[in-house]
């Protein structure tokens, strides 16, 4: 009787374990399916766009408007990336190293542009540079126009992409062990010399990948750019313009061109990332 | 000369308490004590990586307490060497050197001439430590702080390197504070400091 009871309780435990394993497997499968659906949703429209639009890329590249838009986009995105790198690196470095007064305020300011809609960012910059403000009228008095110029495009791109640079560069600096800097200091380096001779070279791959993300973000910016400069047209504005005037067929080749152009830096970025994983930094 | 007078410091949860000691000019002092007793923290404090909360640090008789590391005349060999991975062996040794003759003599004496063109990430643990030692000596420091610099060397190599180091110390006259767990290293020192729970006992 006791033995039978023992057996039945063991059978019960086994059944329980099996049910548990089945539930676990079901949960696992569900998680995979949900993840796969999202991945498909992210990838398929882009693949479709390139597949259907690729045939028109050749023609698009013979269209002077597209060529001009590509040129404007690359020049302004490169300008925005350079400004983000030059002005953003010191901020990124400070955030990665020191705990100082106002650190959280700086971090919040840096995150701010990520939280507001991009057209709103454009409107905010428009307010700053309009002739109604002292700053805007001073710029205009000096003959420096922002609205409707490459400078406006750069300003819009910088506003939305600089935070990405700062956060990626901050990670790149944080990965460099501070002891390297300290050893350089004991070997006679000033803080700046140690940064230039040790920290910067050790962070260079991370900084390069930060710059690529920034550039790709600047190239694909639409909302803030369109508010500040409908003309000269960047590629994203041109594709929107063609879409509203000529429909999907007109917009598709340009959209495909833009995607192909933004895929190139992303592939370069992946390559850098894989490289970095094998690199010894500590 | 290295002098700490009533030095207190706090790094994270870890404290250095009322540390007072003197290592006279040209003396090789061993600093021993259990793991996590504050030995490395004390070296970093003397070298200037950490500022004390109170107390005075003197190097060569000069108060360096508030001074940046690059003005202290201290050579520092951290545990594991911390060779700059983006530079080769030669560039590492030359990093803070004032003249090429010193570099040439150091590399010859410590037997690392054949490693000069190598990538430092490809060196063995022992080779890295010797390179790090040479790099710290190249600027001709007044004081050398060593954090278990010979731990990765086999016994033979260890004895050779230690002999060469002692000979160089007599010639150049620098002062040494040497953190070690090795009893034979500690015996080769002329002064012995023992640290426990953040204090010199």
Regions found by a protein language model. Name each.
Chain A
Residues 5-10, 23-29, 47-82, 94-103, ...:
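Periplasmic/extracellular loop-to-transmembrane helix junction in inner-membrane transport proteins
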Residues 127, 222-248:
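Glycine-rich helix-loop "coupling/hinge" segments at transmembrane-helix boundaries
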Residues 4-5, 67, 122-158, 192, ...:
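Membrane-interfacial helix termini and adjacent extracytoplasmic/periplasmic loops
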Residues 59, 79-110, 123, 127, ...:
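Transmembrane-helix boundary motif in ABC transporter permease subunits
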Residues 34-37, 44, 76-81, 92, ...:
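Alpha-helical transmembrane segments of multi-pass integral membrane proteins
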Residues 41-44, 87, 109-119, 143-170, ...:
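Faces of alpha-helical transmembrane segments in polytopic inner-membrane proteins
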Residues 2-8, 26-32, 37-48, 102, ...:
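C-terminal transmembrane helix and the adjacent membrane-cytosol boundary/short C-terminal tail
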Residues 98-106, 134-135, 149, 179, ...:
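Membrane-helix interface segments
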